[in-house]
């Protein structure tokens, strides 16, 4: 959106923050008071985008712009979220439960499995957000929402903290968080589709990004890659 230090850019950021804050508050209220999971979905979704901007402002200030909300995350991102919402609305939030019902389990077991599924959704959302935010904070100026094709002077190879356990904690975090959004909605089909599409996306992105990282850091990155997993299943 151009230079951050213009009245239009600042106004846009203020309005976007206010809008996301309202969505979070309303969604959280509907979720907690009325028990509608769709409210929780919007609360976690708006919080994610608010934190993307806040952490960028706090730890990657030189990169800050309206784009840091990553609301322009591509048509595929919003289409996927829309499909998830439609599945939830059409199934009454019981898509997963209906699939389990087809297995002819006893009703108490079906209720238990569905309860575990939705409880796991909260775990996925919180864990995913934690990993994503922690990765951005620990990487500092070395973090970027866009794959860097050229090394900047502030770009360092971060191998400690959360990066000592997985090479791409921000991707792992987003992967887990995105699955959590669909699990919270009680979706079955969208959860599977998200898993497949995100795996393919990150497989390609990691391959591209690591080619650049090897060119930036040479053998240091090669050795790091041998010792630490990517964090996403079936992606070495």
UniProtKB/Swiss-Prot annotation:
Record keywords, A-Z: Membrane, Methyltransferase, Pheromone response, S-adenosyl-L-methionine, Transferase, Transmembrane, Transmembrane helix
Catalytic activity line of the entry: [protein]-C-terminal S-[(2E,6E)-farnesyl]-L-cysteine + S-adenosyl-L-methionine = [protein]-C-terminal S-[(2E,6E)-farnesyl]-L-cysteine methyl ester + S-adenosyl-L-homocysteine
Gene Ontology terms: cellular component: endoplasmic reticulum; endoplasmic reticulum membrane
Pfam families in UniProt: ICMT
Binding site for substrate: 205
Broad EC category: transferase
Subcellular location: Membrane
Annotated GO MF terms: protein C-terminal S-isoprenylcysteine carboxyl O-methyltransferase activity
EC number(s) on file: 2.1.1.100
Main subcellular location of this protein, as a coarse class: membrane
Gene Ontology biological process terms from the UniProt entry: methylation; peptide mating pheromone maturation involved in positive regulation of conjugation with cellular fusion; peptide pheromone maturation; response to pheromone
Transmembrane segments: 3-23, 24-44, 76-96, 108-128, 174-194
Amino acids binding S-adenosyl-L-methionine: 155-158, 163, 168-171, 209
Membrane topology label: Multi-pass membrane protein
Family named by the database record: Belongs to the class VI-like SAM-binding methyltransferase superfamily. Isoprenylcysteine carboxyl methyltransferase family.
Functional note: Mediates C-terminal methylation of the isoprenylated C-terminal cysteine in M-factor.
Name of the protein: Protein-S-isoprenylcysteine O-methyltransferase
Species this protein is from: Schizosaccharomyces pombe (strain 972 / ATCC 24843)
Lineage of the species this protein comes from: Eukaryota, Fungi, Dikarya, Ascomycota, Taphrinomycotina
Gene: mam4
């Amino acid at each position: 959106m151009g230079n951050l230090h213009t009245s239009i850019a600042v106004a846009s950021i203020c309005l976007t923050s206010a809008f996301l804050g309202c969505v979070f508050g309303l969604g959280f209220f509907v979720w907690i008071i009325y028990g509608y999971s769709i409210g929780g979905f919007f609360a976690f979704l708006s919080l994610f985008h608010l934190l993307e901007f806040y952490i960028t402002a706090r730890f990657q200030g030189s990169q800050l712009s309206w784009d840091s909300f990553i609301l322009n995350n591509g048509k595929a991102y919003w289409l996927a979220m829309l499909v998830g919402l439609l599945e939830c609305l059409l199934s009454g939030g019981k898509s997963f439960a209906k699939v389990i019902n087809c297995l002819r389990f006893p009703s108490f077991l079906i209720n238990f499995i569905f309860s575990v599924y939705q409880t796991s959704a909260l775990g996925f959302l919180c864990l995913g957000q934690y990993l994503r935010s922690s990765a951005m904070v620990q990487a500092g100026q070395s973090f970027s929402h866009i794959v860097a094709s050229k090394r900047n002077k502030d770009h360092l190879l971060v191998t400690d903290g959360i990066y000592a356990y997985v090479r791409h904690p921000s991707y792992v975090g987003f992967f887990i968080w995105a699955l959590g959004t669909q699990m919270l909605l009680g979706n079955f089909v969208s959860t599977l589709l998200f898993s497949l599409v995100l795996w393919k996306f990150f497989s390609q992105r990691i391959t591209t990004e690591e080619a650049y990282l090897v060119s930036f850091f040479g053998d240091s990155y090669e050795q790091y890659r041998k010792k630490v997993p990517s964090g996403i299943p079936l992606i070495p």
